[in-house]
Structures are given as structure tokens and as C-alpha cells.
Amino acid sequence: DSSIVVAAMAGLSEKPVKTFSIGFDHERFSELPHARKIAELYGTDHHEFVVSAEMSDVLPKLAWHYGEPYADSSALPSYYVSRETRRHVTVALNGDGGDEDFAGYVRYFAMKAARLYDAVPGPLKRVIMAGAEYLPEKDAPFSTLWKAKRFLRSGIFTDVSQRHLKMICYISEEDKQGLYTPAMLAAMGERRAGERPDAANYLAHGFEHAKGQDFVNQMLYTDVVTYLPECLMVKMDIASMANSLEARSPFLDHELMELAFRMPGDWKLKGLRGHKWIL
């Protein structure tokens, strides 16, 4: 997404565009090599920065800026890349929104594949899940096995909002409930048997509002009205403004988003592999 933004900027600018990228010591999670290729391709004035474990010292400061519990670990690199970028410019463009407009997340594949998994009989699903639970997990939540287990767990649900919730959650509903005090639970009201978890209800509104769309666009719409504004945009807004940097997201232009949602889901998610196919 950022690469497309850079390409557009380079095509409109008479001088080299300034680009900024942040990476990690661990190559598996670093996008710096790709960023360098894009910078070379478009002849940008490129700046790189690497986040190390020692830089977690800034966490108390970040907690102050966010002012409430915030669980996205990328708040840390977002803060640092904003700080480094502000040393050179006052306004920067980013690629936020591209994944939600054009189906860029792996979970969209998983949700689509889960509909095929629905054909597997329930008893067989339970046998498969029971066997998978005995397999050891490494590097969770990043290992392939951990993701496979999450997929199998989501297959238990037929309710699309609960399945979507299972795809994006890192803790179980039981563990989450265990964090609440009795007073908090009383304030929330007792949940009736068979009732959706509160988080699943929240996601269900997105799917219900997008009933006229195909399944892929229903997923995208749900993320556009939940994950995008309440996680990604919050993260970038606070991380950038904490460093007096104005961050702008071209993919969030309302006319572009309206155009994206007039496109059929198959233009974005082709089969089970071609994500962001139209791009």
C-alpha cells in the first residue's frame, strides 16, 4: 500500500520524494528490504530506522499518550517512525486503509476457506481439533501451526461474527471474562446461555449493515467500521501527533473507498491466494 502511495507521489513530484521506513533486528518481521527496492525504483530520498528491544523504554511515555489500554504492539514502531520522519518533514502520507479497501489480510483468506470447511461433519471437526491441540506451538502468535489451530477453532462456529472474532483474537472469551471484576460483570449484565460474546455482537453489526454486499465485502466493511477507526487510525493519529507530525492516509479518501466497495469481492480476493488481486 505504501509502495502505491510512493509511486503516485513520485509521478507527481518534480524532485525526489522523501520516504521513511522502519524495521526490526529480526529479518522475518522487517520490511526494510522491500522498502529499499521501492526507494531505488522511484529514486526517493530514503531514510531507514531499526527498532531494537532496548527501545521499549519508551512504553511509559506511550501509555501516557494513549491514555487508555491499547493492545496493538505496532504502536511502538509507529511512534519511532513518526519521530524520525518529523526530523525531515511536517506532513507524511501512509498506506493505512489499503488492506481494508482491497482485502489484504490473511484472515480474509481464512474466513473464505472456513466456508469450505463448513462441509466437514461436526464430529470429524472435533476429532481434528482435539488432535491438533496436542501439537506443540512455537513463536505464537506467528507460527503456521498456531494460525492453523486458530483456523480450526473458528470452524466450530457457524455464526459469521463469532468466526471473525476467533480469527482476530489472541485470548479466549473465557480468559477475557476472567479479567473482569464482579462489579464490572454486574455492570455489563449477565449473559444469557447461547448469547454472543459482547465483542462478537460488536462485529455482528458490521456484517448486518453490509448484508447487501458479497461475503468478501462484508468482511471488509466490518473491519472498516471497527478495526480501522478504533485500532489503526487511533494508533497512527496518536503516534504521529505525539511527535507533531501530520499523518495522512490516501486510501481513506472517501471517494476511493466508495469506489472500492462498488467492486465485487472477487476483484480483490481471487480464489484462496490472490489477495488485493485488482492492485
Regions found by a protein language model. Give the residues of each.
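ATP-dependent adenylate-handling active sites, centered on carboxylate activation for C-N bond formation
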Residues: 1-196, 215, 238-279
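A short, charged helix-loop
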Residues: 196-207
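Acidic, Mg2+-coordinating catalytic module of metal-dependent nucleases/exonucleases
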Residues: 208, 216
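Basic, amphipathic alpha-helical recognition segments used for DNA target recognition
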Residues: 225
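Globin-like tetrapyrrole-binding proteins
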Residues: 228
